[in-house]
Amino acid sequence: MMLRKKTKQLISSILILVLLLSLFPTALAAEGNTREDNFKHLLGNDNVKRPSEAGALQLQEVDGQMTLVDQHGEKIQLRGMSTHGLQWFPEILNDNAYKALANDWESNMIRLAMYVGENGYASNPELIKSRVIKGIDLAIENDMYVIVDWHVHAPGDPRDPVYAGAEDFFRDIAALYPNNPHIIYELANEPSSNNNGGAGIPNNEEGWNAVKEYADPIVEMLRDSGNADDNIIIVGSPNWSQRPDLAADNPIDDHHTMYTVHFYTGSHAASTESYPPETPNSERGNVMSNTRYALENGVAVFATEWGTSQANGDGGPYFDEADVWIEFLNENNISWANWSLTNKNEVSGAFTPFELGKSNATSLDPGPDQVWVPEELSLSGEYVRARIKGVNYEPIDRTKYTKVLWDFNDGTKQGFGVNGDSPVEDVVIENEAGALKLSGLDASNDVSEGNYWANARLSADGWGKSVDILGAEKLTMDVIVDEPTTVSIAAIPQGPSANWVNPNRAIKVEPTNFVPLEDKFKAELTITSADSPSLEAIAMHAENNNINNIILFVGTEGADVIYLDNIKVIGTEVEIPVVHDPKGEAVLPSVFEDGTRQGWDWAGESGVKTALTIEEANGSNALSWEFGYPEVKPSDNWATAPRLDFWKSDLVRGENDYVTFDFYLDPVRATEGAMNINLVFQPPTNGYWVQAPKTYTINFDELEEPNQVNGLYHYEVKINVRDITNIQDDTLLRNMMIIFADVESDFAGRVFVDNVRFEGAATTEPVEPEPVDPGEETPPVDEKEAKTEQKEAEKEEKEE
């Protein structure tokens, strides 16, 4: 009770602060300065030329530095975006998206990230290749260069058998597009020590020699084929393409080969200098310095992937650091592609992701207008768009929102009628052409500020809906008339927290406020919370912010008929703090009997971040949360998934074979689809990702009563970790994630997790039963009681 009271007080304080802040405009930067004023190369894009102008690309030495030039020998810089994995996000391959990137973003390049492992090309070569071909064709049609990226990622050795199809793939693409100047071939995205699914390579000259051993024959094949005589080829470098310096020490013998640098501004610091002569490669540790070294030693560099987050895709965004990096790239005419064109819930994604109760995922098809509006872009996407265009970064105010309450587009009155207490009764209300038509207003003609009581009243008693308007500051509506006139409206929004609060005044629109609208005239009428205290009472209430009705007092000056449309609220988003139970220390097995979460938290990419609390399930404490899968499904079913994360410094598999836990469901709705439970570890030695190959599936259309325990559906989840073959028993796993993915389901409700633990293989040796006195009745085993007793004993041991 005390926690709930404190939470209410905190929410009330936040609401008051929001109201106060809304009274003052956002302060402009001091003296009108912008962040770009401190740099020389962030603004402008004169060198960002299109294929129709620049033609075939080539490498030349300009001002003592190898760089990319156009067919005329003039500098050219490619700026654009990389797709995410085409096996996961193929929806970006559409003409509307490409036109948005080419025209609105002013990109002159796109990178097609064709993963080979991780269910990519090696698993389904024909399908994935067809997507690459579609992406190439769209780029050519939209006058953009296109990087065909053979996305070496997991495993990190490009010589691994999973990548055996590289030479054939590039031969086929070159044959389809012989000597096409639009196409750039990227042979190895990120060679690294990542041994997830195969071998990795070291971060030294031995690692570069491995990359070179792989790349040399492909470069030779492309040149000898007659289909890629002069196309630019890009080759990755060790340590996730952070070592172009190693390539500069021993470059590939080819006239048009460049080398990659990849960086993430939250992980890779800038540097103003290279290295002293004769610095051993083992002492070259800064990514920007490695790039400077490569340029100084005669090779050309291309930043084919960079992000505004940390290297794992989360944290940030780090825009100040990004400005320093982009300044460096632009100053040195280094082309760049940002990661990535995805609505995945990661900071580096360009589009708004799905987050439960907060946002829906932006469609990767922007629609026929071929523009993603700023609200559809993530913070990173909005920033990168400005940097591609070379314009000032002016972020929108993302705290403002608009919610349409009544739009009348369905052809109905949406619950509106003449209010029972209206002093003017002969008003006819109907839907005409998608607006609410009010007729018979001749007798409702007081347009003064305070005498609205004499006017006609209408209300939405039959609406039957409820909308949360937390933080609302204004109520607006379109007033449509045959001829400009004066219309006066007062409003009483209603909801559980405010049934009736008299308006302070009526608000009017006058003839000069109207503008032509086809054969009529339209004005927008705005009622503030100061005009309608009821609006403020609902919007700023600490517990209930729902509106479920509205009473409007309508007066006109000589107009018998008016129309109302698009009744909506405008306000400021209020971030209500999520109150979790204490995190506690990371403990495995996790039994939660100490009242803490024992180290469990939401992963950064989790699509659900509701309150994690300790609740009772089957007689003992369990980690619990509420959520629901959305009706409109994103393309990535992990985007909406709750992702539990558990970090422990000494976390290893040991001799265990399974991760097991008790999982309980208390559904409000669960009639179709399934929940797919995945297990992931993030060991640094394996590229921060290993995934159990098998999952645990709960089919919601097969929920059975026998699975119920004390009103909850109970599942003993067991996921095999012995099948993860590329880790050892003593591999430091760092952290464990449990991911509850949506499979076309309608689940909504509360879930519980308990007794999370490693477990060995089940013992199969028979156990001899003890003899039982025939005169005694053997009591049945109460599993619930036994489990509770076990936990109490464990708790007592800890206390001792």
From Swiss-Prot:
Alkalophilic Bacillus sp strain 1139 is not a true cellulolytic microorganism because the enzyme is unable to hydrolyze native cellulose. The active site is at E190, E305. Residues 767-780 have a biased composition (Acidic residues). InterPro entries: CBM17/28 (IPR005086), Galactose-bd-like_sf (IPR008979), Glyco_hydro_5 (IPR001547), Glyco_hydro_5_CS (IPR018087), Glycoside_hydrolase_SF (IPR017853). It catalyses: Endohydrolysis of (1->4)-beta-D-glucosidic linkages in cellulose, lichenin and cereal beta-D-glucans. The lineage of its organism: Bacteria, Bacillati, Bacillota, Bacilli, Bacillales. This is Endoglucanase. Keywords: Carbohydrate metabolism, Cellulose degradation, Glycosidase, Hydrolase, Polysaccharide degradation, Signal. Residues 1-30 form the signal peptide. SUPFAM superfamilies: (Trans)glycosidases (SSF51445), Galactose-binding domain-like (SSF49785). One of its GO terms (biological process) is cellulose catabolic process.
